[in-house]
Design a protein with these regions (language model features):
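C-terminal beta-signal and adjacent terminal beta-strands/loops
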Residues: 28, 615, 641-699
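Extracytoplasmic beta-strand/coil segments of soluble accessory domains associated
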Residues: 38, 46, 63-100, 124, ...
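N-terminal periplasmic accessory domains that precede
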Residues: 62-65, 106-107, 131-155, 167-169
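Short acidic/polar hinge/loop motifs at secondary-structure boundaries
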Residues: 96-123, 171
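Transmembrane beta-barrel wall of Gram-negative outer-membrane proteins
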Residues: 161-196, 207-254, 273-293, 438-440
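Face-selective signature of the C-terminal outer-membrane beta-barrel domain
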Residues: 226-248, 272-429, 433-435, 443-445, ...
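Outer-membrane beta-barrel signature, preferentially recognizing the C-terminal barrel domain
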Residues: 270-278, 331, 389, 431, ...
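Gram-negative outer-membrane beta-barrel transporters
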Residues: 513-516, 535-621
Length: 699
């Protein structure tokens, strides 16, 4: 019998209560902050939102509008090799943005809000686009858009350990000259990670043997420069070209001082540098051909990822010579995609045939060094860290979409992929895979305010080329052997979604899923006592997620809304050592979030507060089991003014409840099913509050 924790029971009860609220019409007021909350106008199976529905939020970009759609959750595109079937649940002008430069979501962040005609929420089955399921947002852009630009300055600071991020933000300009429209943009999306505090080490009997004080900080800077060109014509043809270049810098520092119960002091210093870049060219051209339209897509991606990591261990009180290791990895990644999509209509039937060829490569030179008594790094043999992996993949799909009735839509997609996977520098033959794939998608609108969908899918996953080569984990003193015998996972998947439009009360949605995964990726034994990434025979995943937006105006709180999310997933896989059932490693299995926003009537002020909870299963390696809960409980708030000299200014404080970085490790002397525990490790470290200033505007 499945038992729900009290928090899960409360979340499900709140969601269930929303399902029984009757849908009601909403009223309009003159004050944008006091205006009725976004309530879609039903149009032939669609929920339609216009600019007036978002006036109270004073959005600056199309993305700012989309995130305020009640009960809708944005899903980004899967970052897999090739383009394949659609996974991003956002369209622009009814078209999937099939590229490797951020997709539709990234483009919406560059489109001014006043260029948006409307946002439509539709059922995936009613579209002729394979891969989508549930609710999909179609953002319709005005044809006569004016030249304009957006800017945002978004510095953020942490109270402890991390360096401030002062150069953060974006600048974009969109214009049109004749048949050519263009968007030029530059942005920096930095990241910061930092924590510090005590670590306790216990022996196998639970006796404290060592205490450590650690400080970790990571600074990531990513300067993206992009030019997007669109050409209208001749006739009904449409072309797009996107050029992007992104250098990035990611230094990481991890230092600790160690005090043994014997009184001896030691220290460890790990320094990592990763200064690389990636570049993209994305082009597509669509034109009328015969009874339908043909779209040709080309993608070229390059990435250079040079990583150097130094670990030095010092014996501070004994005077013994330092020990250490250096791991360097110079990796070059490439991807070339050619794709064609031909769609046509026969009566009430929409048909589409797609063909795709993708070539991917990873070329890595790995080097390993040991620190000698003179303090110099001396190279040691490390042939397993160098190699080249390539894959040529062909995919063909046919998609048929048809309305079976005014309330029922059907979509069927069927096809297969052929993959040639090769570790170029070894003597093994090229491995060839043939994988059938496809989906059946049903969308049903039994009555006004209800949307139900069901999707059955055969999915082919992908594998990381890095796992073919050895990738040592210096910070955890754990080897990770390469595995040339990896195969892509496959899965049978069932998803169903129930959506209820509550009128002026908001929107609620419940999604259920079950996945039967074959050849799942996990850590397996390699050689006599090694470990690395490999395949296990099968695994099961099933769970639910409830997403609701509850408008509080009917309760008398004008301008306020409540967003509520609750999710749970159960997983099972056979452990490769013990054969016993256990959860899949590192899966988020419990999550919940609540956020309230209040746009104060009669003013330009708004405020919001939120709280999130995320819980993950343990990581199961062959020589250790650990659990890493980084900020499991997280809360924050912000205050916003929507007109400060024509800009929107927001001040936010996150992690106001001082959530910690928590780690529990159980490390064994060898394989965990046959050797005793070597030590236990416990961490409960400070992260501290995070402060963010955002200034957004248009010009």
């Amino acid at each position: 019998m499945i038992r729900f924790s009290p928090s899960m029971q409360v979340g499900l009860l709140c969601s269930a209560c929303l399902w029984v609220v009757p849908a009601e019409a909403s009223a309009q007021t003159a004050d944008p902050a006091a205006a009725a909350p976004p309530a879609a106008a039903p149009v032939a199976g669609k929920r339609v939102f216009t600019a007036a529905d978002f006036a109270r939020f004073a959005p600056r970009t199309a993305y700012d509008m989309l995130v305020q759609v009640p009960g809708f959750t944005i899903r980004s595109a899967d970052q897999e090799r090739g383009l394949g079937q659609a996974s991003e649940n956002v369209l622009i002008n009814g078209q999937r943005i099939a590229n490797k430069s951020g997709g539709a979501i990234d483009q919406l962040k560059r489109i001014p809000a006043n260029n948006v005609e409307r946002i439509e929420i539709v059922d995936a089955a009613s579209l002729g686009i394979a891969g989508l399921a549930g609710q999909v947002a179609n953002v319709v852009i005005k044809s006569g858009q004016k030249a304009s630009g957006n800017f945002e300055y978004r510095p953020h600071f942490r109270a402890h350990y991390a360096k401030p991020s002062l150069i953060a933000g974006s600048l974009s300009y969109t214009g049109k000259t004749g048949p050519l429209d263009y968007t030029l943009s530059v942005k920096n999306e930095p990241g910061r990670g930092a924590f510090g505090g005590p670590i306790w080490i216990y022996d196998g009997d639970g006796v404290l043997t060592e205490t450590r004080n650690e400080v970790y900080h990571s600074e990531y800077e990513q300067a993206n420069m992009q030019a997007k060109l669109g050409y209208d014509g001749p006739g009904s043809s449409i072309g797009n070209l996107t050029l992007g270049y992104t250098p990035y810098w990611n230094p990481v520092s991890q230092k600790d001082r160690r005090l043994l119960v014997t009184g001896e002091e030691r220290s460890r210093d790990i320094q990592t540098t990763l200064d690389g870049y990636y570049a993209d060219i994305n082009a597509d051209y669509e034109f009328a051909l015969g009874p339908g339209r043909l779209k040709l897509i080309g993608v070229r991606h390059w990435e250079h990822e040079p990583l150097v990591q130094d670990l030095i261990f010092r014996f501070d009180t004994t005077g013994a010579a330092d020990t250490g290791t250096r791991f360097s990895r110079d990796t070059r990644i490439g991807e070339t995609i050619l794709r064609s999509e031909y769609g046509w209509k026969v009566g009430r039937n929409d048909l589409q045939v797609t063909l795709e060829r993708a070539f991917n490569s990873l070329d890595q030179i790995g080097e390993l060094f040991e620190l000698n008594p003179e303090g110099e790094f001396v190279e040691v043999e490390f042939p397993e860290g160098t190699g080249k992996v390539t894959e040529v993949r062909y995919e063909g799909m046919t998609t048929w979409s048809r309305p079976l009735s005014p309330k029922l839509d059907l979509q069927v997609a069927a096809g297969a992929e052929i993959s040639h996977l090769d570790r170029v520098d070894d003597d093994q033959e090229v491995r060839k895979f043939f994988r059938p794939k496809g989906s059946i998608n049903l969308a049903w609108r039994p009555s006004p305010g209800w949307d139900l969908s069901l999707k059955l899918r055969r999915r082919v996953g992908q594998i990381s080329f890095y796992d073919f080569l050895a990738q040592p984990k210096l910070s955890e003193d754990r080897e990770n052997a390469g595995n040339p015998d990896l195969v892509p996972p496959q899965s049978w998947e069932a998803e169903t979604e129930f959506a209820r439009d509550l009128g002026r009360w908001g929107k609620t949605r419940l999604k259920l899923h079950y996945y039967r995964v074959e050849d799942i990726i996990d850590v397996i034994p390699i050689g006599e006592d090694g470990q690395g990434i490999g395949n296990l025979p099968r695994a099961d995943r099933f769970g639910f997620e409830s997403v609701s937006t509850f408008q509080l105006e009917p309760l008398g709180w004008t301008g306020a809304k409540l967003d509520l999310t609750v999710g749970r997933e159960w997983t099972a896989v056979d452990d490769p050592l013990t054969g016993e059932k256990r959860p899949i490693s590192g899966i988020r299995n419990k999550w919940a979030g609540i956020q309230v926003r209040h746009d104060i009537p009669g003013t330009q002020w708004a405020w919001s507060a939120y709280a999130d909870y995320n819980h993950y299963t343990r990581y199961f390696y062959l020589t250790e089991v650990n659990r890493n809960l980084d900020l499991p409980f997280f809360a924050g708030l912000y205050v916003e003014n929507k007109n400060v000299f024509g800009t929107t200014v927001r001040v936010a404080v996150d992690n106001i409840i001082e959530s910690k970085h928590k780690v529990w490790r159980t490390v064994y002397e060898g394989y965990r099913d046959r050797t005793p525990v070597a030590f236990f490790q416990k961490q409960n470290q400070l992260v501290g509050p995070i402060f963010t200033l955002s200034i957004k505007g248009t010009f």
